[in-house]
Amino acid sequence: FGSLAQRSAVSRNTINRLLDTIPRNEDSLVVFDINLRQDYYDKDIICKSMERCNILKINDEELVELGNMLGYEDIDFQDKCWILLEKYKLKTLILTCGINGSYVFTPGKVYFQATPCVKVEDTVGAGDSFTAAFVSCLLKGKSLADAHLAAVETSAFVCSVKGAMPVLPLQYVK
């Protein structure tokens, strides 16, 4: 779930009712893609959403904005991620940084993947494809490292073609 879908009180309540039905155990995956866009969010909605998820997906620009919102302006990006991981009891925090790679933080461990070099046609859909590939791999029982690599490769492919939802070649759907 994300913040954009929570602009309306009706959809926000629906999302929260759905989240209420999810068992809170080690096997559940509750992914919050923060999506801080324009003025479509507020601190209360963001904080409550982070309390409801166990996987947070955020990009580097959103991390700066969130850090400012929570009073973490003068803290380096990795420390912000560790603080968020602990404060919100997350099992995973995914930080995407565009051409500067991406990080997956878990309690006690961080993974880094460089961004593949591609000719960028369109970045719309890059974050969503990253999240979808990552979660799809986890649901298939793949390791965090394998999920991270698949997410990076899928997102890079999406950036190399026009449109947010290209047909993925079979190598990305394994």
Q: Residues of each region from the PLM?
A:
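Conserved beta-alpha-beta core of the PfkB/ribokinase-like small-molecule kinase fold
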Residues: 2-79, 101
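Conserved phosphate-binding/catalytic region of the ribokinase-like
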Residues: 20-21, 70, 74-174
